[in-house]
Amino acid sequence: MNQLELYIDTFVEYLQIEKNASPYTVKYYRNDLEIFADFLRSEGLSHIANVTYKDVRIFLTSLYEQELSRRSVSRKISTLRSFYRFLEREGYVEGNPFVQLHLPKTSKPVPGFLYQEELDKLFEVNDITTPLGQRDQALLEMLYGTGIRVSECQNLRLQDIDFAIGTIFVRGKGRKERYVPFGSFAEIALETYLQEGRTKLLEKSNSDTEFIFLNSRGGHLTNRGIRTILNKIVERASLTVHVHPHKLRHTFATHLLNEGADLRSVQELLGHESLSSTQIYTHVTKDHLREAYMKSHPRANGNKS
């Protein structure tokens, strides 16, 4: 293992232990760092401490030559800026050549969301007379009804649900914890699943578990398992739009804001540290926008002469 690989491994370990980064974040960081390592080797740069601002500019040019999007380039530069900041703090290098690098601002894409008719189709296709159908319905109700992330939903435990006041305890990103309310539809789906479906699924496993959502063998349902379940639900509903679990979170936020919820409350429900992360959801549906226009503009409904 050469020195750069050792630095990368040390940084990744820091992300996992100190920053509690998700496996997906770690994967993307490592990938970005390995791309930079390949560049250094191709340029004959043997020591990371010798990298200059000029080298960084050449690296940036090489990224654009690959026709990567601005967003992808910005993420890679952000990764390397953090990497060098870590190395500088640990005393491995004396400066951060990426500090001087300024990139054009990238606009955040508007998150996709589902219309009510599309949501209704998803909720109608699960066979709630079967254990798996009851689980799928409860899973769907939790993802849309609370807006929690897939990883947060996967890690829900029995003791995290308080049916008396209709809330769940959520362990969020970066060890941040919060309480999120759920409504009557989610309550009914959860109670049915816990009393019937989950009990039957658990019988297939030799061990007990406190996790709420189980796979077909009675074990803990994985993130990939949740995505597979949702794909099957979408297929049964014959939806033509792509639906990933995070789109249900986008839909949750969009529908709340469209119906008058304030931004700060939605921020708290989503577990966003920064309000700017929540502001990307302030788009509205075309129908909602037209309805507001027709109700509010003085010349929207005038008679034509």
UniProtKB/Swiss-Prot annotation:
Primary site of residence: cytoplasm
Alphabetized InterPro entries for the sequence: CB, DNA_brk_join_enz, Integrase-like_cat_sf, Integrase_catalytic, Integrase_recombinase_N, Integrase_SAM-like_N, Recomb_XerC, Tyrosine_recombinase_XerC/XerD
Active-site residue list: R149, K173, H246, R249, H272, Y281
Function summary: Site-specific tyrosine recombinase, which acts by catalyzing the cutting and rejoining of the recombining DNA molecules. The XerC-XerD complex is essential to convert dimers of the bacterial chromosome into monomers to permit their segregation at cell division. It also contributes to the segregational stability of plasmids.
Family indicated by similarity: Belongs to the 'phage' integrase family. XerC subfamily.
Keyword list, A-Z: Cell cycle, Cell division, Chromosome partition, Cytoplasm, DNA integration, DNA recombination, DNA-binding
NCBIfam families: PRK00283.1, recomb_XerA_Arch, recomb_XerC
Domain (Tyr recombinase): residue spans on this chain: 109-294
GO biological process, alphabetically ordered: cell division; chromosome segregation; DNA transposition
Ranges of residues in domain Core-binding (CB): 2-88
Molecular function GO labels: DNA binding; tyrosine-based site-specific recombinase activity
Organism: Oceanobacillus iheyensis (strain DSM 14371 / CIP 107618 / JCM 11309 / KCTC 3954 / HTE831)
Name assigned to this protein: Tyrosine recombinase XerC
Source organism, top-level taxon: Bacteria
A matching Pfam family: Phage_int_SAM_1
Record note on quaternary structure: Forms a cyclic heterotetrameric complex composed of two molecules of XerC and two molecules of XerD.
Gene: xerC
PANTHER family tied to this protein: PHAGE INTEGRASE-RELATED, TYROSINE RECOMBINASE XERC
Subcellular location: Cytoplasm
SUPFAM superfamilies per record: DNA breaking-rejoining enzymes
Any Gene Ontology CC annotation: cytoplasm
